[in-house]
Amino acid sequence: MKTCRSLYFILFITLLSACEFRMAPTEYWSKLFRTQTDSIYYQGKAESLTNHIAKDIEEYEINKITVMDFVDEVNRVSILGEYLSSRIVESFTDRTLFQDRMFHVTQKGEVNEVLQQLNLKHNYLYAKNDLENLGKSLNSQAILTGKITDLGTNIDMHLTLTDVTTGEVISSATQHLTRTKFAIEMLRQY
């Protein structure tokens, strides 16, 4: 009986020594509890919107657009609006989006300077004559505006691409963002 116990003990120790014991959380748990709104998350959302709008840009043969900073429900530019518009600019300037031709996006500094000269503010909707003046001053064929709306359960980012000469909406797209404390904080700071 003692021999049998000793044999089981040795077998148990042998099996236990061959097992790996890990104190760190597995990748499954880190993915499950990972923050959903890191920069890669926003980059993916911006690329999705950009790809949708790029299809219509190809159809209209537009070579240059202006991306305005995105506004909230009361037409103010929040930190989140600035950040997301920068991500959209980044996605549009990716050379893989328009491989067969040159495509340009107006620089933000130039946009802000022209808005100041024309006595305009970042807005979601512009009057037709304001669109024409912006297009002429920025040498742009279309203006991309965006609105960020807090719906309580999530945040909607809606983009509209408008032709500066006709005032016609060329394309529009919406993306739902995860509503986190961080996103709400960025949406409420100007």
Tell what function each PLM region has.
Residues 54-58, 89-98:
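Sec-exported extracytoplasmic/periplasmic mature domains
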Residues 8-17:
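Bacterial N-terminal signal peptides
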Residues 146:
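Hydrophobic beta-sheet segments that form the core/acyl-binding groove
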Residues 1-8:
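Bacterial N-terminal signal peptides that target proteins for export
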Residues 83-89, 101-143, 151-152:
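Short, solvent-exposed, polar/charged sequence segments at loop or secondary-structure edges
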Residues 63-74:
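Short beta-strand segments enriched in small/hydrophobic residues
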Residues 73, 77-81:
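N-terminal, charged amphipathic alpha-helical interaction modules
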